[in-house]
Each structure stands twice: as structure tokens, then as C-alpha cells.
A protein has these predicted regions:
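Intrinsically disordered, low-complexity segments enriched in small/flexible residues
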Residues: 2-23, 52-55, 59-61, 176, ...
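Conserved CoA-thioester-binding segment of acyl-CoA-metabolizing enzymes
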Residues: 2-76, 113
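Glycine- (often His-adjacent) and acidic-residue-rich active-site loop
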Residues: 68, 77-111, 130, 160-162
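Hydrophobic/aromatic residues within transmembrane alpha-helices
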Residues: 75, 88, 137-138, 197
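Glycine-rich beta-to-alpha active-site loop
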Residues: 109, 114-161, 165
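Active-site-adjacent scaffolding segments
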Residues: 117, 145-151, 160-162, 166-175, ...
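Receiver (REC) domain switch/active-site residues of two-component response regulators
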Residues: 142, 203-204
């Protein structure tokens, strides 16, 4: 597999100026070759959860990327301890009506449908816990690279709360892992490590932490079509007529 040397000056991230909508939880950056890097670092907490505000911001990011047309998108966590723990439990507990429950499910479902439908390659770089809505976000990406270390766990534990994966995991996980394995994970709520996730087909690669960045970037950059360079001016001008 091709890898990218992240010490190369050409791989330096170029920060993008904020759009009209300021982002509290996500940071979007662009690299010289057109790769976009989206970092989720939920403000004011030590763990990432997908609150209504965080999902709303993700939609704004997708709006922006629809305009800016990146060549590929890498999604990762800004937290040292994990990728995404899932939905915001406090918001789930505050739902008092059927309409409120439907709105919450629709918000996440529609957002991840948008992510799954983008026209450029997408990859989730997973280190640490990747649970519930976090795994559903990763499943909406085209590729997934997980870090092979004890803290990395993937699963859909919503069943412990009496709910099912409502943000797309219920249809995407069986496509990757097969119906028996997917049902086992969804009905028991158990989690798997990176190696087991790769064996099941949930992730594409399970790699050591030291090469996680190179592997993720290498997967995406190997998919990018070569850039077309303009021809030298001498080759684009019509030939001069021969002098008499």
C-alpha cells in the first residue's frame, strides 16, 4: 500500500478561513493536493458525542465541501482517547414526545445519508472508542482505518438503552459484515477490537498507531487521479508558417 511521508512540506495542512457559519466542534483544513481533513473535537468535553449542534455543524461542513469540491475527505478525532462515543445521552433522555424522537432520528439519518452520497472518497480514521452514532458515521464513509491497540473498540451498544441504530447502521453494517455478524453486534451490544473489525469487514485496515496517519492518507491519495498539468506555452501555440 502506498504511504505518505507526513514530514514532507508538501503535506502540510493549510487552514481554511472560517465560513459564514462559525464551527465550535469541527475544524476543516485543506492540503495542497486537494485532500480535506475534518477533525471532530467537541468543545468543553473530554469525549466526542454527536449532539444536535455537532450534527448541525457537520451539515454546514458538507454544504461547504459541496461548493469547494475536495479531492478526498479524511475524518478523524481531535480527542486523544477516542473517535466518537455516540449520540448525546442527555438529549436522548430529554425527548418527551414521539415527534421529538422522530426528529432526532431523522437528523442523524439525513446527515449520514449526505455523507455517504458525496462524490469524493471519504475515510474515517478510528482510534479509541467508536460506538453507536460514531460507528454509524464511520460506516457512512467509503473507507475505514482503525488503530490496532487495546483502547480501540467498535460497536453499536444502543440496544442497552432499548433503541436500535437509527442513523444508518442498521442497513450499512450488514452490507459489510454480513447479516449474522451484524445482527449479533446489534442485538447484543457487544464491541470488537480493530483486528476483529477488519476480519468482519467493518474496517479496511487495522494498523499500529505509528503508521495510522500515513496509512489513512495513503489509502486516499492512492485513489486520487493524477493532476493534469498545463502544457508548456510552446506546445499549445500553432506552428509558425514557414517563411518563403
Amino acid at each position: 500500500m502506498n504511504t505518505i511521508d507526513t514530514t514532507d512540506p508538501e503535506a502540510t495542512v493549510i487552514n481554511v478561513a472560517p465560513a459564514k457559519t462559525a464551527l465550535r466542534h469541527w475544524t476543516l483544513a485543506r492540503e495542497p493536493d486537494g485532500l480535506a481533513v475534518l477533525v471532530f473535537d467537541k468543545a468543553g468535553t473530554t469525549s466526542n458525542t454527536l449532539s444536535a449542534e455537532a450534527l448541525g455543524e457537520l451539515n454546514h461542513v458538507l454544504d461547504r465541501l459541496e461548493r469547494e469540491k475536495p479531492r478526498a475527505l479524511l475524518i478523524r478525532s481531535g480527542k486523544a482517547g477516542g473517535f466518537i462515543a455516540g449520540a448525546e445521552i442527555d438529549e436522548l433522555g430529554a425527548i418527551a414526545t414521539e415527534a421529538g424522537a422522530v426528529a432526532l432520528v431523522k437528523r442523524g439519518w439525513d446527515t449520514f445519508e449526505r455523507l455517504a452520497a458525496v462524490g469524493y472518497p471519504t475515510l474515517a480514521l478510528i482510534r479509541g472508542y467508536c460506538l453507536g452514532g460514531g460507528l454509524e458515521l464511520a460506516l457512512a464513509c467509503r473507507y475505514r482505518v482503525a488503530v490496532d491497540e487495546p483502547g480501540t473498540r467498535l460497536g453499536l451498544p444502543e440496544v442497552m438503552l432499548g433503541i436500535v441504530p437509527g442513523w444508518g447502521g442498521i442497513k450499512r453494517l450488514p452490507r459489510l459484515a454480513g447479516a449474522p455478524a451484524a445482527l449479533d453486534l446489534m442485538l447484543t451490544g457487544r464491541t470488537v477490537d480493530a483486528r476483529k473489525a477488519k476480519k468482519l469487514g467493518i474496517v479496511d485496515e487495522a494498523v499500529p498507531m505509528r503508521i495510522m496517519e500515513n496509512t489513512a492518507r495513503g489509502v486516499l491519495k492512492a485513489l486520487l487521479p493524477p493532476r493534469t498539468l498545463p502544457l508548456p506555452l510552446s506546445l499549445t501555440l500553432p506552428p509558425r508558417p514557414k517563411s518563403a
